[in-house]
């Protein structure tokens, strides 16, 4: 039976601590639409590796500080 996985993120929290940055501002800084940022935050869309790095760069953090990959009940870092 294949393991199920989930990618979660801390984008909303990072935006809050970045002077309450709007989704629109983050979208402009990363070259995507506000709707894309919203879908990523809600877990409805998994970003490409390139976009994930761009998001991390905007906040000045490592990619694994933004995104977390979970397999079933374990956390993979």
Protein language model regions, located:
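Short, charged recognition helix plus adjacent turn
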Residues: 1, 57, 67-77
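DNA major-groove recognition helix of helix-turn-helix
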Residues: 15, 41, 59, 70
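A short, Lys/Arg-rich alpha-helix, primarily the initiator
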Residues: 1-18
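Amphipathic, hydrophobic secondary-structure cores in small proteins
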Residues: 38-53
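Short alpha-helical DNA-recognition segment
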Residues: 20-39
């Amino acid at each position: 039976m294949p393991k199920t996985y989930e990618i979660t993120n801390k984008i909303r929290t990072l935006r809050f601590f970045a002077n309450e940055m709007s989704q629109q501002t983050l979208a402009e800084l990363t070259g995507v639409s506000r709707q894309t940022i919203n879908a990523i935050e809600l877990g409805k869309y998994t970003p490409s590796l390139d976009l994930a790095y761009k998001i991390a760069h905007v906040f000045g953090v490592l990619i694994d500080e933004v995104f977390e990959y979970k397999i079933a009940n374990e956390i993979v870092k």
